[in-house]
Amino acid sequence: VGLRFDTRESDSRWIDTVWTCTSEQVAEMTSVATACWGLVFHERDGQAYAGITGPETKTGTAPVPEDASFVGIEFAVGTSLRPVPPSLLVDGGVELEADRGAFRLDGVQWATPSPDDAEALVERLVRAGVLIRDPLVAHIRLGHCPEVTARTVERRFRAATGLAQGAVRQIERARAAARLLAGGLPVAGVVSRLEYFDEPHLARALRRYVGRTARQLGAGAGGAIGLDLNHPSTS
């Protein structure tokens, strides 16, 4: 009962994660802030659906189709769709035309991927010029210092992601905190590991970005949540 996730990493530099999810006897979930945009595909009652999900800057409540099976591709920060400026996707999304086995993007029909061939779809999108990425953002994400001004870095980061660098760091840290708490790490340990100022600072971040308290995350309480809490944190 609820949402059952399975998430894996990808060896593609364009992809953050690939995930599947099934919903059972759940009508809504707590959505969790994310710095990534994605492609999501699901089927319900024999009908296929596809959509683009944008980065989310805060938590909220979202409807969930009952008894549906989802496949999702979360793209690496700095990857974007050439036809859709990232800023237009923030806290939003786009529904795509879909049929059994195919969906339409940028005027072209593409085969709907399974979890195992997400990378093949992404490579086709890259070759077609539908997916693009800013190498400067990728450079920054690896911890390198670019030889341009801070203003140029921020401008290009926003253009590539729709978000400020600081917002991305806060969102990613809160998601990591949620997973650590769900995995049993004490609050004090999370504060120390992720360099929050103190426990109230962590509590505010969880409230804003995750929609759960530390106690709820530790106890697995609060209902369905749009985050695979069993997926290990990289922080």
What kind of feature is each model-predicted range?
Residues 210:
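Short, basic/aromatic recognition patches that contact phosphate-bearing ligands
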